[in-house]
């Protein structure tokens, strides 16, 4: 790894390349049927194998002055290899994210007021989407190809907040925070499901579920 401080430790840069090998990794076998009924043998639906994770991590910080904060970026790959899945070849782990970026900044307006901002971006999680379908006894059966070969949409959002700290005393400290979560209302995907399209018989449509689009908030903190 690489680490260096500048300007009397006011600025800091760290970079590291890593590789990690993992054993006893768990995943569901192809066509697993998971139920949580009493007596259900969940372990029969699991397979065990190995994994690996490697990549580059970078972070830069500014630690003094009116403007403080940090930028971090990770370029990574996380994979599994389990006999019985994906033709016994390496495949993307569910939590694999190629890019992961965070930017955090705080600006002190005066001794009582400060402004803060956060921006995050990451590649969507690896998932397995259906590639086809067929009808069996009146039910739609989806077909799948390689494990985790698809991606959820990228996740990103921006948060802003303003914090007010009244005068302090020896016995009590307090602050008010006024913030906005997901400033530009990004509809980040929580889940994507597939169903028959009633408007176009014989076709399939994807339904995206999103949570927490634009959320204003007020927080009061105190400590003795």
What are these regions (language model features)?
Residues 1-43, 175, 179:
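Membrane-embedded beta-barrel scaffold of Gram-negative outer-membrane proteins
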Residues 1-5, 59-63, 72, 106-108, ...:
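Transmembrane beta-barrel domains of outer membrane proteins
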Residues 6-10, 62-68, 98, 110-112, ...:
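Strand-connecting loop/turn motifs
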Residues 11-15, 69-71, 103, 115-117, ...:
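Transmembrane beta-strands of outer-membrane beta-barrel proteins
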Residues 18-21, 40-129:
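Gram-negative outer-membrane beta-barrel transporters
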Residues 23, 48-52, 93-98, 150-157, ...:
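Short sequence motifs at beta-strands and strand-loop junctions characteristic
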Residues 29-39, 76-80, 85-92, 131-140, ...:
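Flexible, surface-exposed loop regions and adjacent strand-edge segments
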Residues 112, 121-138, 155-159, 163-224:
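C-terminal beta-signal and adjacent terminal beta-strands/loops
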């Amino acid at each position: 790894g690489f680490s260096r401080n500048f300007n009397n430790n006011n600025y800091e840069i760290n970079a590291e390349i890593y590789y990690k090998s993992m054993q006893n990794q768990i995943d569901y076998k192809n066509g697993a049927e998971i139920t949580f009924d009493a007596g259900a043998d969940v372990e029969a639906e699991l397979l065990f194998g190995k994994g690996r994770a490697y990549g580059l991590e970078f972070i830069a910080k500014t630690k003094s002055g009116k403007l403080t904060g940090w930028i971090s970026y990770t370029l990574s790959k996380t994979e599994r290899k389990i006999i019985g899945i994906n033709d016994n070849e390496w495949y993307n782990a569910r939590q694999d994210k190629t890019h992961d970026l965070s930017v955090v900044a705080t600006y002190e307006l005066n001794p009582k007021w400060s402004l803060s901002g956060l921006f995050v971006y990451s590649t969507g999680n690896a998932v397995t989407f259906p590639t086809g379908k067929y009808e069996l006894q009146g039910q739609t059966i989806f077909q799948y190809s390689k494990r985790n070969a698809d991606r959820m949409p990228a996740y990103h959002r921006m948060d802003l907040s303003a914090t007010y700290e009244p005068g302090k005393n020896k016995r009590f400290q307090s602050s008010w925070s006024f913030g906005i979560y997901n400033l530009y209302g990004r509809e980040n995907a929580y889940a994507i499901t597939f169903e028959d399209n009633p408007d176009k018989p014989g076709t399939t449509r994807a339904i995206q579920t999103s949570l927490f689009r634009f959320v204003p908030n007020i927080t009061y903190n105190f400590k003795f």
